[in-house]
Amino acid sequence: MSYSTQQDILDFVEDNNVKFVRFAFCDIFGTQKNIAVLASDLSKALEDGVCFDGSSIAGFMHVEESDLVLRPDLSTVTILPWRPTEGRVMQFFCDVEKPDGAAFGGNCRGFLRSMNRKFKKLGLTCNVGAECEFYLFENDDRGRPTRIPIDFGGYFDVAPLDAGENIRRDICLTMEQMGMSPQHSHHESGNGQNEIDCHHAGPLKTADNVMMFKQIVRAIAMRSGLHASFLPKPLPDQAGSGLHINLSLYMDGRNLFEGDIAPDSIAGSFMAGVLAHSRELTVFTNPLPNSYQRFGCDEAPRYVSWSRQNRSQLVRIPQVKGDNCRMELRSPDPACNPYLAIGLVLAAGLDGIEHRMVLQPPVNKNLFHPAEAEGLGLETLPASLEEAVQAAQESEFLHRVLPDELAARYFTEELKRCEALKNAADPAEYERVHYFNAI
């Protein structure tokens, strides 16, 4: 059934014993929020939207003009399977607008949607996939997270070294119940680290899937008495967690990343744009102070370069065929706002296409070894969140593509993060409370 009208939704609610409906959205950093509406009030909420206090949401509104409205995207409706079957809970993803119906500059879903439309106007179809890594930790006797991983397994290990296989199984089955398409599931390099990948989809669908995936993982982990962490570098001596973004472009049904990529082709110019703007984008793809502990080791890039297959590069072209042909951006981490991260990567690629940027030759060296990078003159990604904010603030490109309101508030909030950690009496404890326990 296609849920395209309000009556479709109301019929679904009645047929499935739904009692609560979550209107879900995210703040400027990608932290999911929601308002639950009782099913008896759903008709009015669908008609009028749901008003809320935008001044209480990071990066949204000032208190003197705080009202905002949630407008549900009816196509995103889903039942939350881990909630009770009696009095079931349903959820929409929502766009955010002003009370008079005017566009709200902080509506990150809207930003990604508008960017995708620009590709469609050029006759291009974007497919996006996300590879999301996360850690599973034990809780203490009081149910509080510890930094003790659930196992000592490594890459592709199996039980008993891999203690997360049943958790991943439950996650994948829940994803399928909710209309998502998990593709791969395995233990990652770090102790207690896991990865589950979804099939590629349109940009907005993939960003919604990332938000839903994190919600599912946390719910299944909590049900199992565990803590799921999407912190980029939760353990200093273990691999960091990434959110690799895979992108392919289609024109007239043909995958432009299939076969050799000419430096001045559409695919080549798209890659050139992503590489050219990668430093400016880093504050959006890697938004935490902790994010910068991940770069340069454990398969996380530091240099702005590309290659085929080589996992030490910022961008790589996997050795695959057909519809699987794509470029992979390896710098983003799972703490990012997926709507902004994917939207800005698309914007950078589009800038490359529109300005006919030419892709530079590949770098076929292992850049995890600093000696290999010496003498190549490669640009580096920012080494800290402060440096990333500065690069973004100085970016003419970002001033062109981002709504001024959104950019100003994002940079302000990021600088607050830097100052808070810098001024903390115990930075490690501050990170534990504000990031490890929450991200």
Segment roles from a protein language model:
Residues 1-439:
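Glycine-rich, acidic/polar active-site loops that bind/position phosphate-bearing ligands
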